Amino acid sequence: WLGHAAFRFDTPAGDRIYVDPFLKGNPSCPASELEPERVDAILVTHGHDDHVGDAVALARAFACPVIAQVELRTLLAAEIGSDMTQALNKGGGIDLLSSHVTLTHANHSSSHGGSYTGESC
């Protein structure tokens, strides 16, 4: 746990996956995580700034994929390119590096930059 809703998962295969990478500006984030040394993939659960956080900057710095709900993926693709993003719907799953990820329902609003970004997952 990296504070707030941010998590880093190091898989048994050695992959490093960040979920909701709100690092800078997150008062609970450990100082050692403010400038990650490696990011292999990013998952963003919904469009609020405290969940999207540093996803765009990290994706650019590490050329890693960002997986997000369809509507949010469209907005992120406009910033980092469609080749670095992948859309997934609630209930859908994806093989991500050495792991499998399934989006599940979450009761929460979702917007980014004033735009609706799909259901939270």
Residue map of PLM features:
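Active-site-proximal beta-strand elements of phosphoester/diester hydrolases
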Residues: 1-2, 17-20, 100-106
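Metallo-beta-lactamase
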Residues: 70-121
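Short internal beta-strands
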Residues: 40, 64-71
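Pre-active-site segment of Zn-dependent metallo-hydrolases
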Residues: 8-48, 53-60, 110-118
